[in-house]
Swiss-Prot record:
Protein name per its UniProtKB record: UDP-N-acetylglucosamine--N-acetylmuramyl-(pentapeptide) pyrophosphoryl-undecaprenol N-acetylglucosamine transferase
Pathway(s) served: Cell wall biogenesis; peptidoglycan biosynthesis
Keyword annotations of the record: Cell cycle, Cell division, Cell inner membrane, Cell membrane, Cell shape, Cell wall biogenesis/degradation, Glycosyltransferase, Membrane, Peptidoglycan synthesis, Transferase
Catalytic reactions on record: di-trans,octa-cis-undecaprenyl diphospho-N-acetyl-alpha-D-muramoyl-L-alanyl-D-glutamyl-meso-2,6-diaminopimeloyl-D-alanyl-D-alanine + UDP-N-acetyl-alpha-D-glucosamine = di-trans,octa-cis-undecaprenyl diphospho-[N-acetyl-alpha-D-glucosaminyl-(1->4)]-N-acetyl-alpha-D-muramoyl-L-alanyl-D-glutamyl-meso-2,6-diaminopimeloyl-D-alanyl-D-alanine + UDP + H(+)
Alphabetized CDD domains for the sequence: GT28_MurG
Length: 357
């Protein structure tokens, strides 16, 4: 039996979906894939649905767990490391790819201890603590943004996006910025965003009716009711969904987006060519979402609106300016598309096989 590539990714869509894109590329070449994650993250649902074997570790994040959490941390990590070693012994992977999430740390150390080729991929424009540490153990260090971890030989390959995203026609071919009325997509990430759920409806209510766009909004399962009440109170019609499964179709539909600035979101905006008002998550570690947004905004593809400055009045002003100028939206869409790295998933898959035992 052909030895698999072990992919470690979990938690939110920002880790899981780029890793799934790489898994697709590997399996297209006949390379089996095994996944290492947890039972609590998004991977527990989407990885088995993709017909990929999922191995789970009992591990959780250390931040925000208080003194008891930190005291227990060595025991939790040692248990997870022992479990990860068992996974590697069972599957004997030819290479191990770490793409973030709680299982990636113990899994990467296990790969290093068993001398399996370790490749890590840092999606964000600011490297996280785990990847800064693991970069010392990795054979190859790959990055989604340029200039990250240069001291460890970081290679800028872009952030992998799913094949369906890369197949979306370019902005001109799909009539981006030319629909009447214009189409607004609001995406708060896979967990939603309370600030967007409450502010966007109020901002839209401030626009003249003739200028209001058609709206689709991913509000998150836990915050769906709050968003529905906000839209009802504002008197704004909306296609409101807890989670959008087919993001390729959603991005294809959109003329403009309002969203967070997670690495996956920015990569998909670029791959498809969608202009956006980016509202970085203020509590993100090392403020990495603001860093993720900078290249996109500097290229003329979007507007940066810090949450500290987010209000219905300010957002309405930004929307009014953009929606009144479809040619500008079309130019912004082309700028976004020019930043895309549609070959990122194939590149990461190729590097895994180059380093394979």
């Amino acid at each position: 039996m052909t030895m698999p590539v072990l992919i470690m990714a979990g938690g939110t869509g920002g880790h899981v979906f780029p890793a799934l894109a790489v898994a697709e590329r590997l399996r297209e070449q006949g390379v089996p894939v095994v996944w290492l994650g947890t039972r609590e993250g998004l991977e527990a649902r989407v990885v088995p649905a993709a017909d990929i074997p999922l191995e789970s570790l009992r591990v959780r994040g250390l931040r925000g767990n208080g003194l008891r959490g930190w005291l227990a941390a060595p025991f939790v990590l040692l248990r997870a490391l022992w479990q990860a070693l068992g996974v590697l012994r069972r599957h004997r992977p030819r290479a191990v790819l770490g793409m973030g999430g709680y299982a990636a740390g113990p899994g990467a150390v296990a790969a290093w201890l068993t001398r399996r080729p370790l490749i890590i991929h840092e999606q964000n424009a600011v490297a996280g603590l785990t990847n800064r540490l693991l970069s010392r153990l990795a054979r190859r260090v790959l990055t989604g943004f340029p200039g990250i971890l240069p001291e460890r030989g970081g290679e800028h390959v872009g952030n992998p996006v799913r094949d369906a995203i890369t197949r979306v026609p370019g902005p001109a071919d799909r009539g981006a910025g030319a629909h009447e009325p214009l189409r607004l997509l609001v995406v708060g990430g896979s967990l939603g965003a309370l600030a967007l759920n409450s502010t966007v409806p109020a901002a839209l209510a401030r626009l003249p009716e003739v200028q209001r766009p058609v709206v689709r909004h991913q509000a998150g399962e836990r915050t769906l009711q709050q968003a529905r009440e906000a839209y009802d109170q504002a008197g704004i019609a909306v296609d409101l969904q807890p989670f959008i499964e087919d993001m390729a179709a959603a991005w294809t539909w959109a003329d403009l987006a309002i969203c967070r600035a997670g690495a996956l979101t920015v990569a998909e905006l670029e791959a498809v060519g969608v202009p956006a008002i980016l509202v970085p998550l203020p509590g993100a570690v090392d403020d990495h979402q603001t860093a993720n947004a900078r290249q996109f905004v500097a290229a003329g593809a979007g507007v940066l609106l810090p949450q500290s400055e987010l209000s219905a009045q300010r957002l309405a002003l930004e929307l009014k300016t953009l929606l009144a100028d479809p040619p500008r939206l079309q130019r912004m869409a082309q700028c976004a598309r020019g930043l895309g790295r549609p070959d990122a998933a194939a590149t990461v898959a190729r590097i895994c096989l180059e380093e394979a035992r």
